[in-house]
Amino acid sequence: MKDDETKRMWGVFDEVGIFVAICRHGFALALADMIQSGEQAKYPLAIVSRLLDAFGNDLGGGYDIGCRFKTTLSKSSLGRHARGKNHTCLVNAFHGHAHNRLCQLDNLVTYVPGLGLEDLEGCERTFSQSNALAPTTRYSTAFHRRQAISNYFDHHNELEVYANLGK
């Protein structure tokens, strides 16, 4: 009974979270509102499309379920475009060890030449840093929620990430 009440209570809000792309330096590159759904394939597909258009060839993206997303991406209408631009889907370092060995050898960041010590866990670090944003946007209008999130990530990029690049 209590679960039904909770679902109804939170059901009045359309936005349930954000899906972000973070570069290896920690800059927020793209954000998408998740609307009345959990993590669905449409969010990373939209982000990949945006990044391919902005940055072009030879991009790689780490995702907790990068192995599954690789299949989704290749079967989508974006698949041909992603293959043409040599996009690679990878599994983040800490999540990859839950996958089977063949998946790890093919997708785990540890085994990909050229990535160095990158763990592709920038989104996890960013979400950890941005946890204080959630209570301030919980009851906001859609406009004010987007405004607060945009301001947070502008501040994050300019005054935290950019300022710390030279350290």
Mark where each language-model region is.
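Catalytic-core elements of nucleic-acid end-processing and repair enzymes
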Residues: 1-167
